[in-house]
Curated annotation (Swiss-Prot):
Residues 92-106, 308-320 have a biased composition (Pro residues). The lineage of its organism: Eukaryota, Metazoa, Chordata, Craniata, Vertebrata. GTPase-activating protein (GAP) for ARF1 and ARF5, which also shows strong GTPase activity. Participates in the prevention of neuronal apoptosis by enhancing PI3 kinase activity. Aids the coupling of metabotropic glutamate receptor 1 (GRM1) to cytoplasmic PI3 kinase by interacting with Homer scaffolding proteins, and also seems to mediate anti-apoptotic effects of NGF by activating nuclear PI3 kinase. This is Arf-GAP with GTPase, ANK repeat and PH domain-containing protein 2. Interacts with EPB41L1, PLCG1, NF2, HOMER1 and HOMER2. Residues 670-904 form the PH domain.
Amino acid sequence: MSRGAGALQRRTTTYLISLTLVKLESVPPPPPSPSAAAAGAPGARGSEPRDPGSPRGSEEPGKKRHERLFHRQDALWISTSSAGTGGAEPPALSPAPASPARPVSPAPGRRLSLWAAPPGPPLSGGLSPDSKPGGAPSSSRRPLLSSPSWGGPEPEGRTGGGVPGSSSPHPGTGSRRLKVAPPPPAPKPFKTVTTSGAKAGGGKGAGSRLSWPESEGKPRVKGSKSTAGTGASAAAAGGGGSAAVTTSGGVGAGAGTRGKLSPRKGKSKTLDNSDLHPGPSAGSPPLTVPAIPVPATSVTATSTQPLGPAPPITLEPPAPGLKRGREGGRASTRDRKMLKFISGIFTKSTGGPPGPGPLPGPQGLSSSSGSRELLGAELRTSPKAVVNSQEWTLSRSIPELRLGVLGDVRSGKSSLIHRFLTGSYQVLEKIESEQYKKEMLVDGQTHLVLIREEAGAPDAKFSGWADAVIFVFSLEDESSFQAVSRLHGQLSSLRGEGRGGLALALVGTQDRISASSPRVVGDARARALCTDMKRCSYYETCATYGLNVDRVFQEVAQKVVTLRKQQQLLAACKSLPSSPSHSAASTPVAGQASNGGHTSDYSSSLPSSPNVGHRELRAEAAAVAGLSTPGSLHRAAKRRTSLFANRRGSDAEKRSLDSRGETTGSGRAIPIKQSFLLKRSGNSLNKEWKKKYVTLSSNGFLLYHPSINDYIHSTHGKEMDLLRTTVKVPGKRPPRAISAFGPSASINGLVKDMSTVQMGEGPEASTPMPSPSPSPSSLQLPTDQTSKHLLKPDRNLARALSTDCTPSGDLSPLSREPPPSPMVKKQRRKKLSTPSKTEGSAVQAEAKRKMWKLKSFGSLRNIYKAEENFEFLIVSSTGQTWHFEAASFEERDAWVQAIESQILASLQCCESSKVKLRTDSQSEAVAIQAIRNAKGNSTCVDCGAPNPTWASLNLGALICIECSGIHRNLGTHLSRVRSLDLDDWPRELTLVLTAIGNDTANRVWESDTRGRAKPTRDSSREERESWIRAKYEQLLFLAPLGTTEEPLGRQLWAAVEAQDVAAVLLLLAHARHGPLDTSVEDPQLRSPLHLAAELAHVVITQLLLWYGADVAARDAQGRTALFYARQAGSQLCADILLQHGCPGEGGSTATTPSAATTPSITATPSPRRRSSAASLGRVDTTIALV
């Protein structure tokens, strides 16, 4: 009850309805004797006829009826009024002795009143409807629950009486229902909740006891007697924040035994099944209800009491006799379902949103068996489209990403958010700010994304709250686009230039684009605004089909996570010194030079700040070892710097790599692993090892710098993309590379014989070591000469197996080879193949190999030292190799594992063909739907067949599949046919078909049919072909030109200048009768194609080229249409011109005769389009489109 009271909000327009299950037990007057009570009860129940359909309103009040009525609970009328005085602490509730009721004046402020529904019109003039001016309660009023509701003795005097209109329609069925009864007229608005269905009889007003059953239990034994108790009633009232609860406990002393039980076994008569619950033991302590801080609330149960202090209510445990059920039966299934439903209302509700008001009281009443929530929480006055609740205020263990969405009302931001949250499209234009939440998986970790949709301009609180801001505008609404620029300026002024780390995204929505509302914001303008915003990404979405909706939020969340990690890394790197500190305090470790030089002591120490920071950022145990600097590094006594500045490529490549330091400064990727390694290039002439500071980044790049100082300042660094590389370890095969020869590595006893020789480093050069004997099956010799051919791969496999099977983890002698560069591998193959072929014995071949090494290196000790390395190779797909050497086996293996993991992550991040196909299909679905939405495109342009699936590009019309074959026979100079479902649809083709449509095409090509009947969907092919050829080939139905005498060239210029697509199409159709004179009196000698490109009109440019405009035409200054298209910033027009072979604007002013048909190389190269439209747009092509 305390939670329900605390949930009341002090608002004048909000009505809170809390359904409370209150069991009030009437205390009947003490009967003269138990025998009299027992004798009177059956008489009251014995011969009542049950007529559910009989009305009760027509019976006389004094007439007795032999009928039992089932009532669960009477109507509870909850009335709320204006807010009371805030901050007043209500007095405590305490039981008061029963006293004659007197009227209580209404207290100012909000109040909550509960009383029984009277039989007639509600009374007025007091707080309770039964209060009269005299102070005596009305005789026509009955208690909320009569004692027979839970098996108590029937009160005398009201056996057959009833309250009209309060009975259940089917009292005999024992159903439990909730119904809403009309409230009585009152000066304050209120709502009524009525529960009915329990058996109830008449009864006079008496005290009552609050009963809160905790859980269901077994019924009590028959014949349990009522426990006498003391009746009490409590009331409290006060101005402003008063609360009063009136209770009456127990039955009178000397109450008799219960009367005859109902013949209905196991049926509950209360909503909470309290009559089926076992009561607590007789020795149970009384139940104490603490004071409930209810603001301005008064509760009246049976009678009203004088005003006074209200200490906590003490509720005694109910009598066992009153708690047992009928005949000891259990509740029915319907009762349990109803109780579970009503209990779910209470348990699933939470506190209301934060707002002014007193804090909620105790969570519920507590009994010996535990606490139970008794009241429901606040019903939300304005439910949101998506639930938004306490995640805005509660602390959570998972990290939060705060996304703000800004835009105009008509920008489509509400539909965009709704699509992302629910996966469905809904037209929403919210004028109020909203808040949402959703869990997302970013970088393998769950994040709670808090989305805040701002209806107006951002404020200082919003700018400080958001981690990322998404600006949304509609591509068909110019005002929404201008609003985005204004909102960005306001956000920048609030946030300031010095504060970074805010991820931005610009989203253009295509939801409202249609034939009636075309696109007005071009792609170039949107991207220009995106560039001005700095560090902003541009997307075009369609909430109708879900195009790029999830991608926007996923990539923005990824940017937020990346920015956070970069800021943490920057904070950690600020504590680094400007140069690496070399101190003699570190432990020196001896290192042997690879060329057999002397041993030198080298000690290097690095500050621990970046190491700790990276461990905290990545939390990877495998990378901890890699973050520490190796204790010793191989270093030659004298080392010369390479004469070649760049060993991997040209100077331009070096400059491009070094220039990436701008992007890898404060915003570079997070290093996964970093340490000093020795490095040499496998393709350069300089084979010396050089010390490099190597870092493996989370974006799939491996960077190395000459020193850590260069890494901090992002200078003199080089990087390699691991996407197209692999990592290898000399002497080891890849883990999944299994030889096809199987377990034949021990042929001729190679493993058994050669693994017994172990070369040491001390005075003893060799020590016999026992080796596990191979299985007998592996020692079988081949019977033919094929063993000689298998000897070489088997020996290599034996080296790999012996390396992997070495118990100590060191390399065995079989795997100690020179570094496997391509040239060395060829020499080794030649040297190994010669003795194997001549001798035929692997033992002798290996002995000769060792002798060759002995001559080369001078001693077996130097052989061992020269081959003892911890290097690994990175090989690219282009053949480049990079050799790196670590300080130990553990560090090398850690580097190899980290690089392999990053290569796998880079490959997984690549857009697969399925994902690309899905993305393209979504884009094409949007384009095709836009084409179908054009006027007249629902039927075939020639025969009227519904849902055409083919299109004629240069006619701008949709045709059915039967007519498409005839159009294909006309040739591409008349009709370019393309399928809506089978072909690609680039943007320029989509714009042409949406701009023209079947309606405009028929007004041009089918203006005057001259009385000829148009074919239908059932017409034959001959009829269709005759009509189509007369329409498009013979131009019999072509609309006439105007009465003007101007030449076609001037009319076409005027139509292009007016951007009238229909007029341009009509003039181009008439121009097929003869040559089109495009000469106009333009001082710059521009053609209509120049003008269309200057206007950046994609549709007219494409139509002019399809109908034979000169793509190589130049103006007086020698500039082609491509110059004007680029000057206007239209990339689509430039691409169309380049597809048709338009020369660059830097050519000579003289035009060659073949310039119209021969594509020339442009002076300023432009990226080629990836769509298949390039193959269909050339003027001189003779291939039909299918």
